């Protein structure tokens, strides 16, 4: 029993060493799992983040710098951001009409739209005031150049981008702003064009008028001129927004995307069947197929459209099979739309009684092209979605491989551990485990122990007497 008590402290360090080894092994398990999880999440997040980045290639003048797309507003996350309509041969029109008691009068306007066409003459968008007022704003293509013409009570004011070629069938973005009689126009990434009409200052008009006004009528005329000067900077009682230009004699043929005007996303509203919008003529929402038409007739119609001057920048399965000369299948036609940026609108600040407006923000979409060729809006979105999924899968596989390598290394290191720490002193009498668990064996050993002790006592007695 004494041998057992003396030998019992020895296994203690071995057990403690085993516990620390187990802790180290657990630590080696936790660290790679944590790192692998972070690696997988980071890889997947970077791939998903790349989905929202638009890369632009091409000439130094067209789309050389990416423009940020603001996705934060809830209105852009409603599922219709970048709604695209195709205006086919023969023309069509989308008309939005303000309710009679809700027609705005604005000192500043913002217009943004994406389009593609090959026409040299066309009217894209026109905003008109109520009958009898004569105020209007028109976005048009004249001799292959994009321009805007408007009138808010004086003469027609025109602004045009003469350097950019926009009737090349490629996707372009135009942004227009108006503040009183002043205006700016930008196409894609070309420099902003500014227009400041002469005599737009109230003080200049007053100085000219005072020279011919009798002194006794000066105060009354001054007040009238001031009021008239303010009125000549306001777009009064806006009534309708007409998209497509069918009524103007130059119907637009091509694609229009994500129209934004002073907070209104008219194409989005048209896709949602807004009660204030009327669609007429050959106008089709991208991805929409009339229920009365079969897949074969739809493919034939698309093929005939592509043979005309209308450059439809949308790709569908039926169109692609028709181009290859194969028989169209019964597979559904997929919808591919591009994101559209929306320029923010500012509410006019005026002392007059103007209907309140609510500013909104957003962004306008830029085209994506590769190698100088024409890439249809929306096709790159599918590629980015698949690449994001691939990146996430690769990240998970890499993390799993890292875990396996670390596990194999740990198993190799701790499989043949040195057992030198378990020293057994042969000179000491250790009782085996079977002796600890079997009481009968211990009792059998007791007589022998008693005899050995008596023998030692006798030897001591002998030594004492000697």
Swiss-Prot record:
Alphabetized UniProt keyword annotations: Angiogenesis, Cell adhesion, Membrane, Signal, Transmembrane, Transmembrane helix
Tissue-wise expression: Brain and arteries (at protein level).
Transmembrane spans: 391-411
Topology in membrane: Single-pass type I membrane protein
Extracellular topological domain: 45-390
UniProt KW Transmembrane helix keyword: yes
Signal peptide as annotated in the record: 1-44
GO annotation, biological process: angiogenesis; cell adhesion
Compartment list: Membrane
Region (Disordered): 347-383, 433-466
Main subcellular location of this protein, as a coarse class: membrane
Pfam families named among the record's database cross-references: Laminin_G_2 (PF02210), Syndecan (PF01034)
Disulfide bonds: none
Entry GO terms, CC: membrane
Keyword Aminoacyl-tRNA synthetase: no
PROSITE patterns per UniProt: LAM_G_DOMAIN
Family: Belongs to the neurexin family.
Described function: Neuronal cell surface protein that may be involved in cell recognition and cell adhesion by forming intracellular junctions through binding to neuroligins. May play a role in formation or maintenance of synaptic junctions. May mediate intracellular signaling. Plays a role in angiogenesis.
Protein name listed in UniProt: Neurexin-1-beta
Organism: Gallus gallus (Chicken)
Biological classification of the source: Eukaryota, Metazoa, Chordata, Craniata, Vertebrata
Gene name of the record: NRXN1
């Amino acid at each position: 029993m004494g041998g057992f008590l003396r030998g019992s402290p020895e296994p203690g360090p071995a057990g403690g060493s085993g516990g620390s080894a187990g802790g180290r092994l657990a630590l080696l398990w936790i660290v790679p799992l944590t790192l692998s999880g972070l690696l997988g999440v980071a890889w997947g997040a970077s791939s998903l983040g790349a989905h929202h980045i638009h890369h632009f290639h091409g000439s130094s003048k067209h789309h050389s710098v990416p423009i940020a797309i603001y996705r934060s507003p809830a209105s852009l996350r409603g599922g219709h951001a970048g709604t695209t309509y195709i205006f086919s041969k023969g023309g069509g029109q989308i008309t939005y009409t303000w309710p009679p008691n809700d027609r705005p009068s604005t000192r500043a306007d913002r217009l943004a739209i994406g389009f593609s066409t090959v026409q040299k003459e066309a009217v894209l968008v026109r905003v008109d005031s109520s009958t009898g007022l004569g105020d209007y704003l028109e976005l048009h293509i004249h001799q292959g150049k994009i321009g805007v013409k408007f009138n808010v009570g004086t003469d027609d004011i025109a602004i045009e981008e003469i350097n950019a070629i926009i009737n090349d069938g490629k996707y372009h973005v135009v942004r227009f702003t108006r503040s009183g009689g002043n205006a700016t126009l930008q196409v894609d990434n070309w420099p902003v064009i500014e227009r400041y009409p002469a005599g737009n200052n109230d003080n200049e008009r007053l100085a000219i008028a005072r020279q011919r006004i009798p002194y006794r009528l000066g105060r009354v005329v001054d007040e009238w001129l001031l009021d008239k000067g303010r009125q000549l900077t306001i777009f009064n009682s806006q009534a309708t927004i007409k998209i497509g230009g069918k009524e103007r004699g130059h119907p637009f043929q091509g694609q229009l995307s994500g129209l934004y005007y002073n907070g209104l996303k008219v194409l989005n509203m048209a896709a949602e069947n807004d009660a204030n919008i009327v669609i007429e003529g050959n106008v089709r929402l991208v991805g929409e197929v009339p229920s009365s038409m079969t897949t074969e007739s739809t493919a034939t119609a698309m093929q005939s459209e592509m043979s005309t001057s209308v450059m439809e920048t949308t790709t569908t399965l039926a169109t692609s099979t028709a181009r290859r000369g194969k028989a169209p299948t019964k597979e559904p036609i997929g919808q591919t739309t591009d994101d559209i940026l929306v320029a923010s609108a500012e509410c006019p600040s005026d002392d007059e009684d103007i209907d309140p407006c609510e500013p909104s923000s957003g962004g306008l979409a830029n085209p994506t092209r590769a190698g100088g060729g024409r890439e249809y809006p929306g096709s790159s979105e599918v590629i980015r979605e698949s690449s994001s999924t691939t990146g996430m899968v690769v990240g998970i596989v890499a993390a799993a491989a890292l875990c396996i390598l670390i596990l194999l290394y740990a198993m190799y290191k701790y499989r043949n551990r040195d057992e030198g720490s378990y020293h057994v002193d042969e000179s000491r009498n250790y009782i085996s485990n079977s002796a600890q668990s079997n009481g009968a064996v211990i009792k059998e050993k007791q007589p022998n122990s008693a005899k050995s002790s008596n023998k030692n006592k006798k030897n001591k007695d002998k030594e004492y007497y000697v």
